[in-house]
Amino acid sequence: LKNVRAARDAGEETEIFVARHAEEFRKLADELGLDESLHNFIRTRDDLHMRGAQKLWSMFRPEDIDKRAYEGLYCVGCEAFYAQEDLLEGNLCPTHKKSVEVIKEENYFFKFSAFQKQLLELYERSPNFVIPNSRLNEIRTFVGQGLEDFSISRLASKMPWGIPVPDDSNHVMYVWFDALVNYISAIGWSSAVPGADTSRSEAPSGACVQASRSDSVGDGHGVVDSNTFKKWWNETGGVVQYCGKDNLRQQAAMWQAMLMAAGLTPSKTIIIDGFVTGEGGIKMSKSLGNTINPLELVKEYGTDAVRYYVVRELSPFEDSPFTIEKFKDAYNAHLANGLGNLVSRIMKMATGNGVGFKFELVGTIGRFADIKEAHDECERGFEEYNLQRAANAIWNIISKTDAIVQEREPFKKIKIDKAGAEKDIEELLIRLYIIGTMLLPIMPKTAEQIIDLVENSK
């Protein structure tokens, strides 16, 4: 409904409006340096996704779905229904601070209430199912209080943009139903399931139209087929999902119940992050119009600078403020005048004094207690999905290495103790090389430049 209204306000057909904005997000993935072989950009209208959503619907048992009259309080910005007690005074959405709408119509409902016991058992046997633990406790409490069935369709006459419900062209799938399915549709689930043919579902006028079907589908950023789903969902032990704290119930309860109903294994882990907030601590949101265009930041500061800020300066689990001023301060302090200055000073000492990098010495880093400690801490950060912790560990090495330059002053020592100074510079080159390798997942371009500089030092 949000897309339909936004397109109408822009004076465009919904399909044209959505395609134009989708391309902007597709470009963002490229600009942020996401590995094309590891991501698949997917949209509601993609055949791969439509087949997956319709197939999942068709796999539910008759007792999992029923059709009934419904009246609810709906926020267009959140694309979600709210209980009265969850709203602010005046029936305002707690996120957008705008009035919710009363929706009255006949919808299909998913029997969410039937999965309370199974969900609680899932949380009990999987203590790391939701990270951080405070969010696991939150969803456990929510489910423990009892569940209400939720609407999974809208009338196509009122919401003419969505995936047609199998065998009922008068309804399209509710956005939160089909959106959750992308976790399996994007990795080729519909191709991995026999009979995933949705040709019997005819789209009503204005609804998403199916493209031609195939068994191997991609958008130019990674082709997926039946083996892709088996690899990522089954052979790796499950999929890790990331979402904002306002999606906790959808991801950790509703989606898991849908998987159970279809006979699929649950997700492996769900990481819940906080909001990125703007002025006044308000959540950044397209609907609120208080976002900052990351492409503009990339254009001025480069991809790695943006990746650095997101990983190290934003909390992985709590709300984090973002302003241009904070970004500039972090860039100058930790990248330009921090890492950048350190690399420049070490390479100048190495090239100016003919000291080259000795790769065989990298294996001796165990004698540097701070590097081993930071390396272990970095690994723990990645294992616990705490990227900020991993980045802080790397910057501890950077700070220690900078302190060594200040304390030993090899650029001065070289005049009175050439051998000692050269040994210091060799150690600094090793440290710089290790810093480069550890930065690869966070700042790949910068890391590769550092590694190249060190390896080619003479």
Label each region the model flagged:
Residues 1-128:
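N-terminal, positively charged nucleic-acid-binding surface of large information/translation enzymes
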Residues 90-91, 125-126, 168, 193, ...:
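Short, glycine- and charge-enriched coil/turn segments that flank and shape catalytic ligand pockets
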Residues 192-224, 362-364, 369:
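Intrinsic disorder/low-complexity segments
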Residues 7-9, 123, 142-143, 260, ...:
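Hydrophobic residues in alpha-helical segments
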Residues 313, 318, 326-363, 367-458:
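Helix-rich, typically C-terminal accessory recognition domains appended to large enzymatic cores
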Residues 48-59, 95-96, 102-194, 222-352, ...:
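Structured secondary-structure scaffolds
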Residues 40, 269-272, 451-452:
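Beta-strand segments within the central parallel beta-sheet cores of soluble alpha/beta enzyme folds
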Residues 32-38, 63-66, 261-266, 348-358, ...:
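Surface-exposed helix-capping loop/turn segments at secondary-structure junctions
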